[in-house]
Amino acid sequence: MIPSKYKLAPPDDLHPYSESERAKHKIYPDFDPWKHTKEEDEILLNFVSKGYYSTSKVNFESISARSSLQDSLPKLSSTLSEKFSEVVRIREREINTIKGNSKDGMAASKFTDLCGPDFKLPSRLTLTDHRKELWLQELSSPYTPLHKITSFIPHGLKRRQVLEQCYIKQIPLKRAVWLIKCCYSIEWKTGIAKYANSPQEKDKFNAHLLKEWTDNFVHILEKLIFEMTQHYNDSVKLEAWKTEVSYFLKLVGNCYTLELIDKNTFHFWILQFVSKVENFEYLPLPLHILELFWSGICNTNSTKVNESESNPLYMVTKLTDILLNQYYIILHSKSMINDDKYIINDIKKNNSIKESLLASIQKLICILFKQQSLEVFLFPPTSWEKYKPCLIQITSALYRKSDEVAEIKRKLELISYRNETLKYTPPISENKVKDDLILTTFTENSGSITVVELSQVDTGLTGALDDNATDFDWTSYSDQEISTKIQIIQIILWAIHPSRHSHYEAGQLAAKLLLLKINTMDGFPEYEIEDEIWSLVFKLAKLSDKSKALPAVLEALYSLLNTLIVYGLIKVSTYIRKLISSGILYLTESNDKYIHCRLLINLKMSPLMKSQYNMVLKNVMDQDPEYYNNYNFDQIVSIVEDLKVKLPNGDAIEYSNYPMSVKISLGEWYLTYLCNGKLVNETRESLTEKYVLFAHQLNTNHLYFKWIEFIVYHQLIEDIETLEYLMEVLLRYKKLFSQYINDHVLFIKTFIFIIRRILKERDSIAYSLTSFMDFWKFIMKSYSLEIRADTDLRSEMSAVYEEEKAKKEITEGEKDSWMGLYQNIHPDSTSLDQNHTGFSELFLTNLKTFLSSKQDKQAKKKARYNLLLLMQAKNRDYSKFISIYLKRKDFKTSDLVNLLSSKLLTLDQIKNTYGLKYVLELFDIESESNCVFYEYQKRCYIELNYKSVLSEYNVVSHHEMNRFIFKIVNHSTSAKLKETASALLTKNLEANKDKAIQLFYQLVYYQNNLEFLSSEELQEFAVNNSPQKLYSYLDFTNLWLFQSFTKFYIHETFQNTNEDKVKVGDVIFSIIETTKYNVLCAKIFEDIRDHRVTDLVIELFEQDFFKKIISGEEFKAEFLQMLIEIINHLSMHKGKTNDRSGEQSHTSYELCVQVMAHFQQLSDSELSAKEIELDVFMKIFTVHQNSVFQEILRDTESSSAMIESLFALFERVNFSLRLKLMFYEVLSSLKSYCTYEAGISDEQSRTKLMHKLMCLPPFQVSSFFPEEDDTDCTRDPALSLGLDLGTASANSTSSTTPSEGTHKKRCAIWDKRLHKYTGELQRKPYYCIKNYQDTEDINNCSLNLSLFDARYERNNPR
């Protein structure tokens, strides 16, 4: 309803305002009527008549909206994504494009021979609009003879106008086709006269004209389809629209048959249009159009022999991908009408629409499945994961309708194998080679080192955890990358390992990832993760005895387990039950029960578990009564109660004497006490006191962040100084900010409100002198997506930035602009002496006051503001006098720390005065726990100047070596810093070769124990052990260190032995034996950049493996798994640095031929027993595929033997479909390589070779399954995928398998009189034609080109 105009009169009984407010305001309270606009009226009427409905951003209110605000892919993969997107664009632009019909001769005009010699095209005549309309009406009337109106065609009818008039006037189809052909012919005749002497230009014009007409057909068809939704509420218009669409489809069909449309372009448009339809309302009509032109797209009715004349295979592959994608989208959609104006309440109707669309698409996919090559069902891995269940569901319909059940199941199995079992899948055996986790402690005279050995290691996960950028999308990462329980174990071990103790966020990050994984659709159940965690705890307890309990590990473990208990992921009751049932408590000689008791004492305990808790402690009273006497449940409750009295009174408490359970209980109580008490504003001193208590003494960071949220949301911040300290804390623990603060946007908005609306007025002087730019930069970097999505926050952040810039301009401006600040600080002072002496006196006086311990807080605060004003207003003078102050050395170390914490001094100023060495010595002095900004500044400075910092240490000195190692372990927390540290570590190892073992052993020992060994202990270890001994300490936490050491050690061995392969091989195999075939061995060579060393390592492993196969030696499964990973990693690493990634030495090639012959000589049963070795051999073969193919093309005797062996093994390997596919891939790639690679001189030998390869059967079911097994494709368990494909009839049979010779095309002359073929034609194959031009490798990948939708046109070489 639109409000009308009215006047307001003061109410009779309303009391007026007070006299003081009557001057400028109305006497009575009043409000203005709504000043509406035309647009608002339309919106109002629309909502009143139709209602308002807004779709939710997520499916359920309990689901986080983060996924809708942030990008789905992690930012670390953005570069890779861009590269692959560029590849796809290039492929679509250069390869998968319709290039016209000039090559096929279809671009030639269809009107070259129109009719007899007397035939003439109608002439063009200029008519008025009225007469043109009459002419069109006569043409559309079936009662008007055609010969009366065919003498001329009106001007203005061209292309789109002709087509539009045809469906608008409903011109009979025969007349419409005549009009189109005439207009086309007139246009062609006019244009072809320009290019009479240029056949090349004539062909271009023909192709261009045909494409122009095709584009106009497409344009009108698109327009008609999208007009559908405009006529929902008008039945008359809707009926007229149906008539127009029906007519135009018939017209398109006729022109399509008469080849007035470029078929390839039209087919491509149909596929693109079906793929881009997102609104399900439009989908039925595109599907109908697809069915109309199905035979043309799929070539089902083609009788052409020449493959190049048919549609490319990629078009059918694209069609398959589009249909499966649409099927997947519809299957997972809840509503079939995606429009705000519609709400489907009728579930049956919605399901009916959904089933109808699914049935239409299912029918088309089934046709493709039965009629097309299996290659059209090959997809990228990400797409296959989506399409696999859909394809199984679709083909299940064929089981009920078809008798060829076995054939269908075989096709589906072959497609599944082809998509899932690529060449570099993990080998080999289905049996587990090792336990998931093995913890080993190596004890030396100097100490012990615990090594963590995992059956599988995700190095990418370790890198992501180490980096842990504040803006990293862990939600997407956990959903996409974390898929196994061994990764869960790896996350927990990373969080509690001593080498990661500098990651203050480790425990909270691990808990967050476990929580995210549980909440994902394919996540693990809670009880499974809880079982894994407690199993890990039991394994850790076995490592240590009573005297040494790995304190660095256990402290982090206490914190992590308590965090998981808070989130409800684990329960202490479950732990106690497992502990009692294990029987560990009743073993008198068991030392790990003491670890369990200590762990239990440090866990937060519920009163319900009191009896079980006390029972566990009582079981060890005979060996150690201290646990029960000091830490029984009642005693812990009593301790907490005593501390509750002491803490508010400010009594001195030694918190380090109490277990973690006491600290957590006390911290929670104190937080409740603060929040429920009288609310007072927080000052810097009180905030610092609580920071020291929660973060350092109680080790409960999560409680301190809760307190921060409380005081921010309640606006309990006294002044700018307090706010500045709060920002320093948030910067110091910025990686916890994103994890502990629940609503980042609300928190930031409240923060800005406090600064701009409250503290800016309350404490204007401090606001003008204090810079918050570092904090705002952190917010902008970490929460850019949230800021972009929230317009209010974006505008607030812009205003904050402008104010920060304005502050700087005021203090750096003219005298009048900052003199006001000085007058506000010193209201009693009248002027400021601007001469040099005045500045000196002011600087020294305020500096002395600030550093004096006798001055009160207010005087120090004023002195700091004076110094800040001097620093900003006269920066050059301030830097000069601060340098003089430093050079006098009239200060204590604590004074420098105080100046740095107060932002009155920078580390660069100290470095410029005393050098970097002095700065590093200052860092080694432990500061007080409340120096938050100093700790943040120190860490940022080290990371920013990391290379210079590490280069400053001379590792020859034992003390300098320890400081160098300390910096590496504590600050190499990102990939960039690790790369810098790795380069400098290698450099120091090379410069101090005599102390290399000592340096690296000290590094590994400190990383594991956080303690340094003495120089005598290091010397003793270096004398008694070889460098290979160090590799026994390899695990996922120190892999990057061993990569640096391996680079140094292998290069040193390579040079000292004069490149002796035997000696280098002895060293390498000794390293492998020392690690006991650790899965990480494949990655320790990655830092080696010298391709000679890399080639040698690959050659040594290959030749050793080949010789052992020939000699018949048995292999350990761990060795085979490690072998193939080493060769794959090194080969791929070489491919990134040079183009020789696939080269193989001649010796290795000869051994490869011998191995093939060896496998060929084995019987079927022996060959089946060697499946694992054959699998590894074929993977190695594919690594050097191009190199091997080049050897084969030289046509040596060994090459012929190689091909014979490949074909023989391909025929015999029926026990493993994966291996059979691998042989097929190799042969198929060899066939492509030989076909298109030039340079063979002997044509006869080439013909013989190609004749053999041309007999390779096509990719179909009969090529991979023997005929005698057709009746039951699931008989052999090795060929089963574990798919639920339905039950097949035992008597069902498949189609007859064609013989090998039927795949070869033959040509002969057909005698019509005798009705038989006579005189077979001998055609010289195109691949036997000489080509003297050099070409590049066309198949330098391990997979067949058909996987990538690539296709080569069969044209003679130029």
Swiss-Prot record:
Any one Gene Ontology cellular component term annotated for this protein: mediator complex
A Pfam family of this chain: Med12
GO molecular function, one term: transcription coactivator activity
GO BP, sorted A to Z: negative regulation of transcription by RNA polymerase II; positive regulation of transcription by galactose; positive regulation of transcription by RNA polymerase II
SMART domains named among the record's database cross-references: Med12
Signal peptide per UniProt: none
Cell compartments where the protein resides: Nucleus
Keywords recorded for this protein, A-Z: Activator, Nucleus, Repressor, Transcription, Transcription regulation
Chief location of this protein within or outside the cell: nucleus
Key word Nucleus present: yes
S-S bonds: none
Family: Belongs to the Mediator complex subunit 12 family.
Subunit structure: Component of the SRB8-11 complex, which itself associates with the Mediator complex.
Function: Component of the SRB8-11 complex. The SRB8-11 complex is a regulatory module of the Mediator complex which is itself involved in regulation of basal and activated RNA polymerase II-dependent transcription. The SRB8-11 complex may be involved in the transcriptional repression of a subset of genes regulated by Mediator. It may inhibit the association of the Mediator complex with RNA polymerase II to form the holoenzyme complex.
PANTHER family listed in its UniProt record: MEDIATOR OF RNA POLYMERASE II TRANSCRIPTION SUBUNIT 12
Protein name as catalogued: Mediator of RNA polymerase II transcription subunit 12
Classification of source organism: Eukaryota, Fungi, Dikarya, Ascomycota, Saccharomycotina
Gene name tied to this protein: SRB8
